Every structure is written in C-alpha cells, then in structure tokens.
C-alpha cells in the first residue's frame, strides 16, 4: 500500500479534538502524545522480551510488535495530516537527507544539521 493511500484511509478513523484542523494545537498535541504513547508501548514490549524471555523473540512477540507498529503508523499519518503534509513527501525528504549524509560521510554522528 502506498503511504499516501494509507494516510487518506487512516484519516477516516480520526476522531479526536482538533482532527482535520491543521491550525489546531489541540489536534497536534493529541496526535503527538498518542504517537509517543504507542512508541512507548513498543519499547515496553521489547524491554519485557529482554527481561522475561532472555531476548528470545517469538512469533507472538513479532505479531504483538507488528500490531503496535500499526498504531504508531496511524499516529504518524495523523501527525502528517495535522501538519498538512503527505507522508510520501516526508519519507522522500527523509531519504534525501540520509543519502546526502551518507554521500558526505556524516551519516554517523549527532546533530540534525550534519
């Protein structure tokens, strides 16, 4: 599925304060907090694999993480909507940035403006 098609389809299920209003700090805040929450759920599941399963990843773990990754993707799509940008634009811009860093030999290191 193309990311922009996903973004459109996911927006049909977007029911939250400020949904669809690109000027709404309420909407932007809501989806940002949701994204962080879902990413935290992934981190927590991975932590428990390390703690409780000696780092052995089962198919059940993979399925659970895939479900959480879907939730992350939903919030990423809504964040893009709140910023009035297509996911394809975001992903292409990111790849361009990373390729530039690789070409210049600065892909490792730190800082946004390398």
Swiss-Prot record:
Superkingdom per UniProt: Viruses
Under CDD domains, the record lists: NTP-PPase_u4 (cd11541)
The cross-references to InterPro entries, in alphabetical order and at most eight, read:
MazG-like_dom, MazG-related_GP37
Q: Which cysteines are joined by disulfide bonds?
A: none
Signal sequence span is none
Q: Which Pfam families match?
A: MazG (PF03819)
Please identify the protein, giving its name as recorded: Gene 37 protein
Q: Which organism is it from?
A: Mycobacterium phage L5
């Amino acid at each position: 599925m193309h990311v922009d098609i996903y973004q459109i389809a996911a927006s049909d299920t977007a029911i939250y304060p400020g949904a669809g209003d690109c000027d709404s700090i309420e909407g932007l805040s809501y989806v940002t907090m949701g994204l962080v929450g879902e990413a935290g759920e992934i981190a927590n599941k991975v932590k428990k694999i390390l703690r409780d399963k000696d780092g052995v990843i089962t198919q059940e773990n993979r399925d659970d993480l895939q479900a959480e990754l879907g939730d992350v993707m939903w919030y990423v799509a809504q964040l893009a909507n709140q910023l009035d940008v297509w996911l394809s634009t975001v992903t292409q811009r990111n790849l361009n940035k990373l390729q530039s860093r690789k070409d210049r030999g600065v892909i490792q290191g730190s800082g946004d403006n390398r």
